[in-house]
Amino acid sequence: MALKTFNPTTPGQRQLVMVDRSALYKGKPVKRLTEGKNSNGGRNNTGRITVRFRGGGHKQAYRLVDFKRTKVDVPAKVERLEYDPNRTAFIALIKYEDGEQAYILAPQRLAVGDTVIAGAYVDVKPGNVMPLGNMPIGTIVHNVELKIGKGGQLARSAGTYAQIVGRDHDYVILRMNSGEQRLIHGRCIAAIGAVSNPDHMNISIGKAGRKRWLGRRPHNRGVVMNPIDHPHGGGEGRTSGGRHPVTPWGKPTKGKKTRSNKSTDKFILISRHKRKKK
C-alpha cells in the first residue's frame, strides 16, 4: 500500500504522511473475535505509573489474533484484510472449510480470496504455516515461535521478517532484521512471508494531537525538570545535565546492557550489537 500526503491547508496537514488504507475492510471487526480493552494510563494494579507518558487516546477493541495456528491441514480462505489499532501490521480474517473464523497477521502479497493452510509440509507461499525444520534455506518468515507450541513471538511488527540461513542438527539458524542470528528448534512453527504494511516506517504523525489520539502524552526531558524529579534536573539556566545520561531512577541509559537471561545466551550465535562495535 502506498503513502498518502495531504493538501497543506493547516500545519498539521502539511506535515502529515499516512499509509493509504483504502483497500482495507471499512466495517466493524467480528464481534466474537474481539474483547474489551481497559485503558490503564500507564498504571499498574497499585495505581502507580510504570510506563511514563501514556494515557488518553481513542477507545479500542482488542482483536484476538491467532498466533499459534493449531488448526492443522484445514484450508482457510482469506475473507478480508482489516486495520488493527493494537498493532502496526494489518490483520486478515480467514474462514476455515469447517466454518470457523480467525484473525491472523496479514503478510505482504496476501490478497482477499487466497487460501492459506498450516501443516507439516505445505506450499511455500505467504500466509502458510509449517515447522521451521521443514522449510528450505533462504525462506522469509514471520510470526516465529521461540518455544514449541507457545505461539509466534518474533517478527510480528509491520514490515518485519526473519530469514532461515542454515541448519544445525535439530535447530535452524535464523537471521533477524536486527542482524542477530540465533538457533531455534526445528519443530517451532513460523508463517511464510514478511509482515504487511512495510510503509509504516515512513509515516509522519504531523501534529501532537494525533499522538494524543494514539494514547501518547507529552515527553518531558530530564534536564528541564527539578532535582527532585530527575537526576539531570536543576541548575541555574540551561545545563547539559552534568553527568552521563541516566533514567529518572539513576540507572545508565544509552548503551547499558540490560539482558539478564543468561540461560538462552547459547542460542544467540551472532549478537545484534556486533555491528555497532565495528
UniProtKB/Swiss-Prot annotation:
GO BP field: cytoplasmic translation
InterPro entries: NA-bd_OB-fold (IPR012340), Rib_uL2_dom2 (IPR014722), Ribosomal_uL2 (IPR002171), Ribosomal_uL2_bac/org-type (IPR005880), Ribosomal_uL2_C (IPR022669), Ribosomal_uL2_CS (IPR022671), Ribosomal_uL2_dom3 (IPR014726), Ribosomal_uL2_RNA-bd_dom (IPR022666)
PROSITE patterns named among the record's database cross-references: RIBOSOMAL_L2
SUPFAM superfamilies: Nucleic acid-binding proteins, Translation proteins SH3-like domain
Pfam families xrefs: Ribosomal_L2 (PF00181), Ribosomal_L2_C (PF03947)
One example GO MF annotation: rRNA binding
Residue ranges of the region described as Disordered: 222-278
GO cellular component: large ribosomal subunit
Keyword presence, Cell inner membrane: no
Keywords: Ribonucleoprotein, Ribosomal protein, RNA-binding, rRNA-binding
HAMAP family, sorted: Ribosomal_uL2_B (MF_01320_B)
Miscellaneous comment text of the record: The initiator methionine may be removed.
Binding partners and assembly: Part of the 50S ribosomal subunit. Forms a bridge to the 30S subunit in the 70S ribosome.
Family membership noted in the UniProt record: Belongs to the universal ribosomal protein uL2 family.
Function text: One of the primary rRNA binding proteins. Required for association of the 30S and 50S subunits to form the 70S ribosome, for tRNA binding and peptide bond formation. It has been suggested to have peptidyltransferase activity; this is somewhat controversial. Makes several contacts with the 16S rRNA in the 70S ribosome.
Entry protein name: Large ribosomal subunit protein uL2
Organism: Rhodopseudomonas palustris (strain ATCC BAA-98 / CGA009)
The encoding gene: rplB
